[in-house]
């Protein structure tokens, strides 16, 4: 055994003093006891709280196979448990006691790393199943036993995902679970009938609480349910049929990847378990050899590498190059490609899978040995690191004490020696990973055209010398370029940039200058300002923002694609240039041109966001806020790139911006709901209805599927909850108070300013009674307000309103209220007068009031006039034809007016053309960071057409 280093001896002294204060004869006497207690604060704290555990360890030292007794030991403790609070205490204390024994064995090398992983996994499984079974019996006593149509009792099956499923759990870990039951039906033998979905949902909620909730005894495991179908927005539990339907119809590649390690917890219910495995197998393992998964895994790896950069992670042995995740990817690429034919590859555990890969000669024996050795080395290091404080971390420490702990625990003389071996192991893994899965980046060699531009960056060239390099530049442009470079060089000199960063910048700048100066439009002074000096002025702020962050400089240097896209997009839009400068993490989005310029399916935004958020711990609110903002910025960049290149027409641009906003709204509501439910429980009436009893109504451009790049969100919050309902948590509050706080929380999540800015500006002034009204209205109060108190302009706003989040019951109620309100018969002359007065008021406040300018949005003949015409027509004629209220967007409203012969087809087409062309121009003005004001001569034909329609329908 290695001697203890100075930091460990100092730590041991502090620990020994604490043990003396216990007045029990449990001082660490033996050398191995002293070593162990100097390694882990978690072990020390638990033995101080339970000194009898140390006595027990001395009498019955931990053994490799003692996990076989976990169930028996725990059942003895649970025999006298009669309430949920006692259950939680017993589970937590048992968990901590066994973890102390595992940490003890691990430090002494008395069990192998594989045996450690097995013990950690079996401990988790034992605790999960024991908690489930205790709660199942209690729920059956309260609500009856869930049965299928044949009267057969139905169990709750729990699928363990990730390392839990593979039997490779780490010391301090989340557990990823999916809850499943075989068949639908109702409970039998209870005080009242309850359908199986409701029973198992309640059981699942109790189980999560019992395992996850922090108490004075700590927690059992942090439970993550986001890998289930539909993630947080989906049901908590699924029947076999519902699960099968989801994976057959909607299962994604990343879900196949996750399912490789899926394992059903517990040894009971074997028949149902085998049925479930048989059902999932075709989704996970394809019958044919499936090479498409390589690209999918490459994409997932790219997402992880971006996360490492975004979160500033370094020295991360899980996510870094050559880390644990890459070893898992290597094994799973063979499982997903060949597992359908080679049944022996259908294993959840990694190390046995590697041996099968070697046996099938899919990798060389030496490579498999390097992967296995690297995996065991990294997993031991990870467990030692996490056992210090029972913290889920894979980042190497920077302080001397914890480095000394890892050095001793890994059997090295010094930290430097440990790091050398770690780097060797990870480099070997990285080489195999790159060979197998590859890298998507374009690493082409330096082109000869770059070489002459080194002097432009490194030396003070004269104007004439630059013109020799780029003969097509005129003198004025050349002089401006030299000035821009000189100022940038001076600014760089004031920044903290190390030798490595300086070297990367000196290699990057000649490439960038060559590409910019040799552009064919170098002297163009067109409307897009794409001449060289303008492009450089837009790119330079980005370079200044990353000049001390070498990782991003290297990203641009090593990828021709990224450099080309930076120049192209900055040339096209100052808005994009500003976004890249403010948020350099967006550079990652430029790596894959196919991704950048290929529109995402409209219905895919929610799933993309769900995948994006899965990598962030649910309880890390700060990172969740950042992730939402980063996702939005990345998707905005993608949409803008597709807009600029003509891939997306104007109608589709707004569609994508709207669907993106809806995906984010759903994520924000669910995130806020989770935070509130954790604090207060959920409103008790939800046990009698589906959904959350909460809806978000989108007004304005969101309601009309017409969002622009800088649009805010006009939202109204509705609830469906009876009076006198309370939440069911330990800190129970009135349910309507719960919904009010939920809405306030949602507003906070949108408006909180992080390093990535605010998520959206949200305007809630369109709610009943405006700023003086309640932030959340009951559905009944909303109906009453629309019927008895709302102004005409509020009914105009309702034309463009639709539900963007909520359950079916609320959706049906809202549509009924909207339908009844808009179909109310009105006096035509009074309606015309009220609409006209509101329009005049808006023009007075928002119009340009300049004879030589035309405000596309606010001036007569512009977009607002078109919107008011559409709203007037709906309010005027819906009483006669209720089908006119079907749509909330202007284009389809005009289609309806023409279809039902209220408006002439040519007039409807003319208004639609004017509306679409003006919106298109607004999008592009936003990309150029220009206002909505243009020359009075722009859109003159459209202005005249709109004015004629206005006069016809709303003129005096």
Swiss-Prot record:
Gene it is expressed from = glnE
Instruction: State the organism of origin.
Output: Photorhabdus laumondii subsp. laumondii (strain DSM 15139 / CIP 105565 / TT01) (Photorhabdus luminescens subsp. laumondii)
Gene Ontology biological-process entries: regulation of glutamine family amino acid metabolic process
Transferase: present as a keyword of the record?
Answer: yes
Does the keyword ATP-binding belong to this entry? yes
The Enzyme Commission number assigned here is: 2.7.7.89, 2.7.7.42
Where in this protein does the record put region Adenylyl transferase? Answer: 450-956
The record's annotation in Pfam families points to: GlnD_UR_UTase, GlnE
Broadest EC class assigned to this enzyme: transferase
What reactions does this protein catalyze? [glutamine synthetase]-O(4)-(5'-adenylyl)-L-tyrosine + phosphate = [glutamine synthetase]-L-tyrosine + ADP; [glutamine synthetase]-L-tyrosine + ATP = [glutamine synthetase]-O(4)-(5'-adenylyl)-L-tyrosine + diphosphate
Q: What is any one of the record's Gene Ontology cellular component terms?
A: cytosol
Name used for this protein in its record: Bifunctional glutamine synthetase adenylyltransferase/adenylyl-removing enzyme
Query: Where do the record's region annotations for Adenylyl removase lie?
Result: 1-441
Name any one GO molecular function.
ATP binding
Cofactors per UniProt? Mg(2+)
């Amino acid at each position: 055994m290695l001697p203890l280093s100075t930091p460990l001896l100092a730590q041991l002294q502090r620990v020994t003093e604490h043990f003396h204060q216990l007045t029990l004869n449990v001082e660490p006497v033996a050398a191995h006891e002293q070593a162990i207690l100097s390694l882990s604060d978690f072990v020390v704290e638990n033995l101080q709280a339970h000194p009898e555990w140390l006595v027990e360890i001395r009498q019955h030292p931990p053994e490799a196979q003692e996990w076989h007794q976990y169930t028996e030991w725990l059942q003895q403790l649970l025999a006298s448990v009669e309430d949920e609070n006692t259950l939680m205490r017993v589970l937590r204390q048992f968990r901590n006691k066994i973890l102390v024994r595992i940490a003890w064995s691990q430090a002494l090398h008395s069990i192998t790393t594989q045996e450690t992983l097995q013990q950690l996994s079996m401990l988790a499984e034992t605790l999960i199943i024991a908690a489930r079974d205790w709660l199942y019996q209690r729920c059956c006593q309260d609500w009856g036993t869930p049965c299928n149509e044949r009267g057969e009792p139905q169990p709750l099956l729990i699928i363990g995902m990730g390392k839990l499923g593979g039997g490779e759990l780490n010391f301090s870990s989340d557990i990823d679970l999916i809850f499943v039951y075989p068949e639908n039906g109702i409970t039998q033998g209870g005080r009242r009938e309850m359908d199986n979905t409701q029973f198992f949902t309640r059981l699942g909620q109790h189980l999560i609480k019992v395992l996850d909730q922090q108490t004075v005894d700590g927690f059992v495991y942090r439970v993550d349910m986001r890998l289930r179908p539909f993630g947080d927005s989906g049901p908590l539990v699924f029947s076999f049929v519902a699960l099968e339907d989801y994976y057959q119809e909607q299962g994604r590649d990343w879900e196949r990847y996750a399912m490789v390690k899926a394992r059903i917890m517990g040894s009971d219910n074997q028949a149902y378990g085998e049925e479930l495995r048989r059902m999932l197998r075709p989704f996970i393992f394809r019958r044919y050899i499936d090479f498409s998964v390589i690209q999918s895994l490459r994409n997932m790896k790219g997402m992880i590498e971006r996360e490492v950069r975004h979160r500033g992670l370094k020295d991360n042995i899980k996510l870094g190059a050559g880390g644990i995740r890459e070893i898992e990817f290597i094994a799973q690429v063979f499982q997903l490609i060949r597992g359908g034919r080679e049944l022996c590859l259908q294993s959840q555990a990694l190390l046995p899978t590697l041996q099968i890969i070697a046996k099938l000669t899919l990798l060389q024996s030496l490579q498999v040995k390097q992967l296995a050795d690297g995996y065991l080395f990294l997993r031991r290091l990870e467990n030692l690191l996490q056992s210090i404080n029972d913290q889920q971390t894979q980042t190497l420490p920077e302080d001397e004490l914890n480095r000394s702990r890892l050095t001793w625990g890994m059997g090295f003389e010094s930290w430097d020696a440990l790091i050398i071996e770690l780097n060797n192991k990870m480099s070997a893994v990285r080489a195999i990973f790159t060979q197998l899965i590859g890298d998507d980046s374009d690493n082409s060699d330096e082109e000869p055209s770059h070489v002459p531009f080194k002097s432009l960056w490194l030396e003070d060239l004269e104007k004439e010398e630059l013109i020799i390099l780029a003969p097509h530049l005129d003198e004025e442009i050349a002089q401006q370029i030299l000035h821009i470079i000189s100022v940038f060089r001076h600014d760089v000199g004031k920044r903290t940039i190390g030798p490595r960063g300086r070297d990367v910048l000196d290699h990057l700048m000649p490439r960038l200058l060559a590409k910019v100066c040799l552009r064919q439009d170098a002297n163009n002074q067109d409307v897009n300002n794409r001449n060289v000096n303008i492009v450089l002025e837009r790119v330079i702020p980005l370079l200044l923002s990353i000049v001390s962050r070498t990782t991003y400089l290297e990203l641009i240097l090593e990828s021709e694609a990224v450099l080309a896209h930076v120049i192209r997009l900055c040339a096209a839009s100052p808005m994009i240039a500003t976004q890249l400068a403010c948020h350099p993490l967006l550079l990652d989005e430029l790596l894959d041109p196919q991704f950048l310029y290929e529109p995402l399916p409209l219905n895919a935004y929610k799933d993309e966001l769900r995948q994006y958020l899965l990598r962030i711990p649910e309880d890390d609110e700060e990172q969740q806020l950042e992730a939402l903002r980063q996702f939005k910025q990345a998707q905005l960049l993608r949409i803008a790139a597709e807009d600029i290149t003509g891939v997306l027409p104007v109608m589709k641009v707004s569609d994508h911006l709207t669907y993106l906003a809806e995906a984010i709204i759903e994520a924000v509501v669910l995130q806020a709901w989770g935070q509130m439910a954790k604090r207060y429980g959920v409103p008790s009436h939800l046990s009698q209805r589906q959904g959350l009893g909460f809806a978000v109504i989108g007004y304005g451009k969101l309601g009309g599927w017409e969002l622009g790049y800088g649009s805010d969100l006009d939202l109204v919050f509705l609830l469906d909850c009876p009076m006198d309902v309370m939440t069911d948590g330990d800190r129970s509050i009135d349910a309507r108070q719960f919904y009010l706080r939920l809405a306030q929380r949602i507003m906070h999540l949108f408006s909180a300013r992080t390093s990535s800015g605010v998520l959206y500006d949200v305007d809630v002034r369109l709610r009943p009674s405006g700023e003086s009204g309640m932030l959340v209205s009951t559905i009944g109060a909303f109906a009453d307000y629309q019927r008895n108190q709302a102004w005409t302009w509020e009914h105009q706003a309702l034309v463009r309103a639709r539900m963007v989040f909520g359950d079916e019951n609320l959706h049906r109620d809202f549509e009924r209220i909207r339908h009844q309100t808009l179909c109310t018969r009105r006096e035509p002359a009074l309606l015309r007068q009220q609409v006209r007065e509101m329009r005049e008021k808006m023009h007075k406040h928002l119009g340009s009031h300049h004879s030589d300018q035309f405000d596309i949005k606010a001036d007569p003949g512009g977009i607002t006039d078109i919107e008011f015409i559409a709203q007037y027509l709906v309010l005027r004629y819906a009483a006669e034809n209720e089908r006119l209220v079907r749509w909330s967007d202007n284009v389809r409203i005009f289609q309806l007016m023409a279809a039902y012969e209220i408006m002439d087809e040519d007039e409807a087409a003319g208004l639609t053309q004017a509306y679409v062309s003006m919106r298109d121009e607004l999008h592009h003005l936003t990309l150029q960071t220009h206002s909505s004001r243009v020359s009075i001569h722009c859109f003159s034909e459209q202005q005249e057409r709109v004015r004629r329609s206005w006069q016809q329908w709303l003129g005096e």
